[in-house]
């Protein structure tokens, strides 16, 4: 990931602490999985009346590995499976959204953007040097909204994490004011907290 959010479920408060620097997933692994699943998708096990398949790209930050995303989709398209409808989605911090938005729009991705409200409410969402990510994220998301307004209206949503710097009402009104959207909301993850850090974490 290119951020180091203070409350990250893989962060310093958790027993499964992982700096998320273990490298990118390899296309060879994805190809094996797609080949295996294709046999199931094209078999009697697939009882979906629409034959729709949704593939999600999640991280870490998936836009850091756009090479893999593009390779995966190109491979799926090369399989020539006209009986199946493929949909794609991703959850992103939007730090690299300006670089890749044209491709995401071309492939009609559903995008879930992580943002906790305004700049104060999003203060836990910092980069590796402790700097706020807010201005860059808003700039990138605004660029997407202005360049592809219809797509933005239909395919882009927001997820806000609730903590001591915001509230349900504050998240709602901030995202609504910034982008005209109603955000989804999630609570802080309390699973796997290091016992010695619970009291400190509880103040967030």
PLM features per residue range, with description:
Residues 125-138, 142, 146-204:
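Radical SAM enzyme [4Fe-4S]-AdoMet core and its adjacent flexible, acidic
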Residues 1-7, 133, 137:
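Active-site cores of enzymes that catalyze phosphoryl transfer or operate on phosphate-rich substrates
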Residues 71, 99-103, 170-174:
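A short acidic, amphipathic alpha-helical/loop segment
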Residues 51, 84-86, 107, 151-154:
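A short helix-to-beta-strand connector/capping loop
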Residues 53-55, 88-90, 111-113, 154-160, ...:
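Hydrophobic faces of well-ordered beta-strands that scaffold small-molecule active sites
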Residues 105-111, 178-182:
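Glycine-enriched alpha-helix->loop->beta-strand junction motifs that scaffold or abut catalytic
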Residues 3-99:
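Conserved alpha-helical substructure of the radical SAM core
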Residues 14-15, 62-64, 94-98, 110-131, ...:
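Conserved radical SAM core fold
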